[in-house]
Amino acid sequence: MRRAVTILALVAAAARPAFADDPLARARSLYNQKQFEAAVTAAEQARATPSRADAADLVAARAYLERYRASQTSDDLTNARDRLRRIDPQRFQPRERMEYVVGLGEALYFDEAYGAAATVFDSVLQSHDQTSADARERVLDWWASALDREAKPRPDMDRQSVYVRIRSRMEEELALRPVSGTAAYWLAAAARAQGDHQSAWDSAQAGWVRSALAGGDRGAALRADLDRLVVRGIVPDRARATAQSPELLRAQWEQFKERWRPDAAMKN
């Protein structure tokens, strides 16, 4: 999973001045600020109003999932699962339904039910319903990560078909959304997982160059992710496959990065 992909922001239901009097709106705001413990507390307060109990449980569940992702504390995952199970999503608006489905996918992923998680995330990607560009980036990363985990223990023939699927979707994403850092990263990562060393190298270079499309911090995050992938994965793999020195390949990568530094044009 890419380190740089951010949390999926929850939709805000009220204006900021009302937060002090609206525990549900406050819980959503705290979640979006990554104050997950405080978000859970506010969500529990909001749950006292029966008509808002399901929405409050959704915020709490997502907050517990983020806490689990950071701490790996089993109680956080259990609490998230308990809240997701008691939600009745029938009255949710489309955006809340999407948040609920993503929460289900994340819980399945953390339960190591990777194939089921990928299926859930795929339903979100296929729907194109109420999904912002940022939300799609995150779900796309979850989907690819789940398939990657599902594929690793499989026989080689089965793994190949999984990574072909990932590469195909990432190519489609880049054609439709050239700014997608997740697609640029996974195009290289999936090629590497297939043992397609040249395509992995080429895709990493292409992703580095097109990182400017992601812009600012996101572009920098994509370059950092690609650099780790190349140095820790693609270079050693390619060195073994081609009998080239890892030091030589790392030097070639460093030279490439220097030629395509984002600020290189400013120095000429």
Name each model feature, range by range.
Residues 109-197, 202, 206:
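Extended amphipathic alpha-helical interaction segments
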Residues 18-70, 74-79, 253-268:
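N-terminal leader/linker segments that initiate helical-solenoid repeat arrays
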Residues 162-193, 198-268:
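Eukaryotic alpha-helical solenoid repeat scaffolds
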Residues 52-68, 95-106, 134-153, 182, ...:
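Amphipathic alpha-helical repeat scaffolds of TPR domains
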Residues 30-44, 71-85, 112-123, 155-169:
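Helix-turn-helix repeat elements of alpha-solenoid scaffolds
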Residues 64-76, 106-116, 143-159, 193-201, ...:
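Alpha-helical linker/edge segments of TPR/alpha-solenoid repeat scaffolds
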Residues 46-55, 84-99, 126-139, 171-177, ...:
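Flexible helix-coil transition and linker loops at the boundaries of alpha-helical arrays
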Residues 9-18:
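Hydrophobic h-region of N-terminal signal peptides that target proteins for export
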